[in-house]
């Protein structure tokens, strides 16, 4: 049964495979190779135990299916004729190995200050993922903008290459600018950074930053200011496209049901997978 499943998926075109699992075949093969290399390094002759029911190729498919569709472990388990606890272990193990391989890691905020690779223009934005109502400290996660409990992810990307440089996650209640201050992200003086109106006041931290002009209670925007905001929005729109590409994985767009402490790991991993597709010249559509 599993062999026929793998064969069926391999017969899909590249576009069909992406629609099914959220990544292209080339990215999938790189993920499989990364997991195999980590497993080969960790295995020793003294280790004993039952053989896994799924091959590494199948385990990666299960993980991609979980991220892409975000069905429960039980429902995915019935598709693969496995228990939900086995599916849970497969997903967690695969995520851990992908990170350990080093092939799916972001550059990190230090790259923003690295003289050799500083980006010319960066775009920064915060996206939110709804979560189930917490049993304790609900106020910490309630987003006034959304009207429900959320987790926030701050993304910093290179405008030219569309590569995500770093990610920082926080609770839904905090303001976008507060999340920026907690993240301790700093830009090189020569880097131009573009943000939305949620980052008013960022000029105190980086003078080469641009945010939209806001109208006040007693003053409307001039035509020149409106044109400025329109031009800035065109430059900043790339970060919205990146958010959309990440959220084809329903684990980031649907209500997040898992432990919150694992959310940041998954956002970073999916961001690195997105970067991987850019790097091999097959940017997610």
Language-model features: locations:
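Arg/Lys-rich, glycine/proline-spaced intrinsically disordered segments
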Residues: 48-50, 221
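Charged, often Cys/His-bearing segments associated with DNA-binding zinc-finger transcription factors
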Residues: 1-48, 282-283
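Short, amphipathic alpha-helical "recognition" segments used to contact nucleic acids or chromatin
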Residues: 55-69
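Short, charged/polar micro-motifs that form catalytic or ligand-binding hotspots
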Residues: 52, 66, 77
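Short amphipathic alpha-helical segments enriched in hydrophobics
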Residues: 32-43, 70, 98, 246, ...
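Short, well-ordered secondary-structure "scaffold" segments embedded in the functional core
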Residues: 56, 73-285
């Amino acid at each position: 049964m599993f062999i026929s499943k793998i064969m069926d998926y391999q017969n899909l075109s590249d576009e069909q495979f992406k629609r099914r699992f959220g990544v292209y075949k080339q990215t999938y093969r790189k993920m499989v190779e990364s997991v195999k290399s980590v497993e080969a390094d960790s295995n020793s002759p003294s280790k004993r135990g039952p053989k896994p029911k799924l091959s590494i190729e199948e385990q990666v498919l299960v993980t991609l299916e979980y991220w892409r569709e975000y069905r429960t472990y039980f429902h995915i388990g019935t598709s693969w004729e496995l228990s939900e606890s086995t599916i849970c272990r497969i997903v967690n193990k695969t995520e851990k190995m992908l990170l350990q391989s080093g092939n799916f890691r972001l550059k990190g905020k230090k790259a923003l200050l690295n003289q050799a690779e500083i980006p010319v223009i960066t775009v920064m934005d915060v996206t939110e993922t709804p979560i189930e109502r917490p049993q304790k400290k609900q106020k910490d996660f309630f987003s006034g903008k959304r009207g429900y409990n959320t987790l926030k992810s701050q993304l910093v990307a290179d405008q030219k290459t569309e590569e995500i440089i770093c990610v920082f996650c926080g609770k839904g209640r905090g303001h976008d600018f507060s999340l920026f201050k907690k993240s301790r992200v700093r830009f090189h003086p020569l880097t131009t950074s573009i943000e939305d109106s949620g980052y008013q006041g960022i000029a105190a931290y980086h003078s080469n930053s641009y945010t939209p002009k806001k109208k006040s209670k007693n003053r409307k925007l001039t035509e020149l200011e409106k044109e400025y905001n329109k031009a800035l929005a065109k430059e900043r729109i790339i970060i919205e496209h990146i958010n959309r590409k990440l959220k084809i994985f329903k684990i980031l767009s649907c209500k997040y049901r898992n432990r919150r402490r694992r959310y940041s790991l998954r956002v970073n991993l999916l961001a690195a997978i997105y970067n991987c597709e850019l790097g091999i010249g097959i940017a997610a559509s």
